[in-house]
From Swiss-Prot:
GO terms for cellular component: ATP-binding cassette (ABC) transporter complex. Gene3D superfamilies: P-loop containing nucleotide triphosphate hydrolases. It is an enzyme of class 7 (translocase). It is a peripheral membrane protein. It comes from Acetivibrio thermocellus (strain ATCC 27405 / DSM 1237 / JCM 9322 / NBRC 103400 / NCIMB 10682 / NRRL B-4536 / VPI 7372) (Clostridium thermocellum). The gene is ecfA2. ATP-binding (A) component of a common energy-coupling factor (ECF) ABC-transporter complex. Unlike classic ABC transporters this ECF transporter provides the energy necessary to transport a number of different substrates. It is found in: Cell membrane. This is Energy-coupling factor transporter ATP-binding protein EcfA2. PROSITE patterns: ABC_TRANSPORTER_1, ABC_TRANSPORTER_2, CBIO. NCBIfam families: ECF_ATPase_2, PRK13637.1.
Length: 281
């Protein structure tokens, strides 16, 4: 499913002395099956923007469309179900006595049949790479990475067509980060899911997304393919961001070895380029 935003403006605490414009005339489209990153410094409007995608926030002005239908009126409730949002530290929202009950919570609220709930929970726990053996355990007995997967399963079990992830690997160790992003990457590739990643990590964005939206002071500063956006290092630095560290390293290396290509975004690309140079040498 696709998302389209036109003329979206959002003002916090409108009409009070604390009024603040968080989004200012945002226009964007995210196509079905895309993997899009949204980056920006703290307070740039990233999280406020994505909370409009499933109606958690309502525009002060402007419109949000899901698959061509405006997120208002009689169809709004059904359209909202198509967008699942996983916020930072989602495991803090785990509360049931078993993993099964936590994952099933949303389905129970929807009034689905017990057999159907059982089938969907088992399917989803496998989808996030966990064993069905943990379904009877307390979620609080699990590791940090497992809790994060269980929390994500609680969203995925509702079968959204669009998955929004706000800093999905925050607080995890390097192994846990890699596992979460491999899970998300597989969901995108194998399930043809539209994925929107909000992140402060330029390395994660460079490695996984196809297109980047750069937010600054409630507006879209840049938008384009990941490689073309990260080439604009000066613009990124002016708004408090940066390209991935490996990009800067390869540019420094090119000063010493002019033959190498410095249009590099990931460690894997850097390894490949250096191996190519060594073979030629």
């Amino acid at each position: 499913m696709s998302i389209k935003v036109t003329g979206l403006t959002y003002v916090y605490m409108k009409g009070t002395p604390y009024e603040k414009k968080a989004l200012d005339n945002i226009n964007l489209s995210i196509e079905t099956g895309e993997f899009v990153g949204i980056i920006g410094h703290t307070g740039s409007g990233k999280s406020t923007l994505v909370q409009h995608f499933n109606g958690l926030l309502k525009p002060t002005s402007g419109s949000v469309y899901i698959n061509g239908e405006e997120l208002t009126g009689q169809r709004a409730k059904e359209l909202k179900k198509q967008v699942g949002i996983v916020f930072q530290y989602p495991e803090h929202q785990l509360f049931e006595e078993t993993v099964y009950k936590d994952i099933a919570f949303g389905l129970v609220r929807r009034g689905e049949e017990k057999d159907e709930i059982y089938r969907k929970v088992r399917k989803t726990i496998r989808l996030v790479g966990l064993s069905e053996d943990i379904l009877d355990k307390s979620p609080f007995e699990l590791s940090g990475g497992q809790k994060r997967r269980v929390a994500m399963a609680g969203i995925l079990v509702l079968e959204p067509s669009i998955l929004v992830l706000d800093e999905p690997a925050a607080g995890l160790d390097p192994k846990g980060r890699e596992e979460i992003f491999e899970l998300v990457s597989n969901l995108h590739k194998n399930n043809k899911m539209t994925v929107i990643l909000v992140s402060h990590s330029m390395e994660d964005v460079a490695k996984y997304v196809q297109r980047v939206i750069v937010m600054n002071q409630g507006r879209i500063e840049m938008c384009g393919p990941v490689r073309s956006v990260f080439k604009n290092t000066e613009t990124l630095e002016e708004i408090g961001l940066a390209a991935p560290q490996i990009t800067y390293l390869m540019k420094k290396l090119k000063e010493k070895i002019p033959q190498i290509n410095d249009d590099i975004l990931t460690i894997a690309e850097a390894k490949e380029e250096l191996a190519k140079y060594i073979r030629k040498a």
